[in-house]
Each structure stands twice: as structure tokens, then as C-alpha cells.
Amino acid sequence: MIIKITNELSYNTDSEALLLLDKEIGYVNISLYDNQAKMYIFIEEEYRFHKYATLSLNALIKEYLKKDNVDRIVFYVEGSSRPGLNLMGKLNVYYVYFDEETNEHVYAVDKDYLANENKKEKEYFDTYDINMNKVDFVWERGKKYPSSLYHIVVSVLLINKDQKILVTLRNPSKTHPLCYEITTGSVLKGETPRQGAVREVKEEVGIDLKESDLIEFGRAVIEDMHVLAYVAFIDFDESHIILDENEVIDYTLLTFNEFAQIIEHKDFHPLNRKIINKSKKKLNEIISRHFAS
């Protein structure tokens, strides 16, 4: 099913100025100005932890969707690194591209992805306060949780004996679609950060790690996440890499100089960029010490 974008936009409030919703065969037809959508993404990125920033917009959309019992839309804006809107609940995913023949932006619904996504097992996560003390609240992915709480995310920088760094390309259905990244994921309920890091690497790129392989080089509070970053020096080559294409669709092995350049690329995962740049000095010291020995 293809949904075409129109340039018709009528609104009475700032929220309504961002997008206009219509019904179409059980899905949602999203009409918007490209610039307005990008404006919303910027606001969400900058003020994500302020729940009231999007309250009126959420209320407006839920009113439109109430009859069909649909309470989640995800749409991607061309050139953007994150979804424009992410309401909690049922998942609908729209891919956006520019159709040169019709000179229009087009959203395509990936039904196979929706079917697979709806079959996924529920994921649960422990939550923490600002000081990383565990609290008595378990978060289910896709549900809301108090703005004062955080969950743990781990990032793992994999370096082989040839001094090459593994960088992957995110599946277009994920947040930050088609962004370059190092292996990154959330720590599940009952896991330690190191256990979560070992699991994420195995699941996403097929490489076996031991917890003792992980050297922590940085941690930071970013939005609603405690981010822990590790580096692992592993004897692997391309024959060891098995991608989970639901998560990542391609990979490359980069030299240190190439990696330093890609970190600043607009399509590099912003979470990875923040934690690596924040901890760059310690990371460089660890790498230098390892290859000097």
C-alpha cells in the first residue's frame, strides 16, 4: 500500500500545523510539509525528556485514531536520523522516499515487517534512578515509564588484530534508520551490563565474546539512558560476521582514521557519537596500550 504526501495543510494550533491525519483502509494517511516534520523531529530530539512538549500533539493524533484503535505511528522523513513520531502501543511503520517520476514524497507500508514485528516476544528492562541505583519498576518496551527513570544501554567497539573496527548499518525499520553504528542495545531485565553487551554482539553480528573481553571506556547519562561503552579486542575477520538483518543490514571494517571520520558523519548514530567523543581520550589510551604490548 502506497500513501502519497500532499501539500495541503490546514491548522488552528501549532500541533495541527505539524501534520494532518486522514483515514485510509485501516492504515493512517499522513499529510505534512517536509520542513514542518523536520521541525517536529528537532523538537523531539532536543526535548525528549520533557513529556509535556508533545502532549497536545499526541492528544490530537489519538483523537484521529481512536475509532480504529491504533495508537502508534512511526514515520520517517527523508534525510532524518530518527522517527518523526513515536506514540506508545501498536506498531505501524511508514518508509518515506522521493518519487522522481511524480515529484512527490511517498510513504510505503512494509507489511512483512509489521507482521514480524507483531510476532516478537515482549521485552522487559530494569530501570534505574539518575545515580544508576536500581528501582522497583520494570519497563516493557513500547510502554511509557516515569520521566525520572532510566534504563541501561550498552555500546561495544569491536577491534580485530588488523586494527580494524567493525561498523554496521542499521535496518531502515529501526530508530535512526540506515545510520552507521557500533553494536548497541538495551540491557534486558535481570542482565548485567556486560551480559547484555555479550548478548547484543552475538545477536547482531554473530561474534562470540566473553565478559572478560570487555573493557569499559566510558559512561554517560543521555536522555533516558545510562549508556555504558566498551571496547573489545577480538581475533575476528569477515568470515566470523553473521548479521541479524532485522537489526543491521550491512557492515564494514574501518581503519582508525576512517572511523574517526565516520563518527562525525551526519548518518553516524548520535548516541554512539556522544559517548565516543565524551570518552575519546580514555578510549585512545586503551587502544594505544593494547597495540603497544
Regions found by a protein language model. Name each.
Residues L166-V167, I182-I215:
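The catalytic Nudix box helix
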